[in-house]
Amino acid sequence: RCSYDRKHETIYILNEIYKRGMSNRQLAEEIAPLVEGDTKGSSYLSPVSGLCFQDHSDIYCDAAEPKSISDLKDCGLKQARACHKEPGCVSYRVKWLQHRRIVIDPKRTPEAYREFVNYSYATDKDGNFLSELPDKDNHTIDACAYALDRLIYRRGVSA
């Protein structure tokens, strides 16, 4: 779960579900208590910053997984939807994230903390940075970008 403070361009990563080998049904069971009864959104106090945020229970998923999205909806998570998908969108999302301050509590979200701290551009055999971003060890980074999809692709907002 992420929140975004537009005024300060700050992303708060508030909690995570990070488990390997889960079925879509098991994932839905983990997510449901976090969004139950929250279809219109509510406000809450961030445990990280102490700031009040508007929370929306939209669930953005990898657009390459339409069957998984359908499964989540079949399990009662009607707010599951595909994130924006077009050529270059992964690079654009990461660029958008790079231009914001990101606050991560390593105790509440250890996997997100690990990934964000360790993620970097690919290197060649001599250790020189390449322009490409590796598509590995970035599951929580992807999840954060999916969660903020509506903001990232909002008209008039740039990376």
Positions of PLM-derived features:
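Charge-patterned, long linear interaction tracts outside catalytic cores
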Residues: 134-159
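Mg2+-dependent endonuclease catalytic cores in nucleic-acid-processing enzymes, primarily RNase H-like
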Residues: 7-135, 152-155
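Gly/Thr-rich phosphate-binding beta-strand-loop-beta motif of the actin/hexokinase/Hsp70
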Residues: 1-5
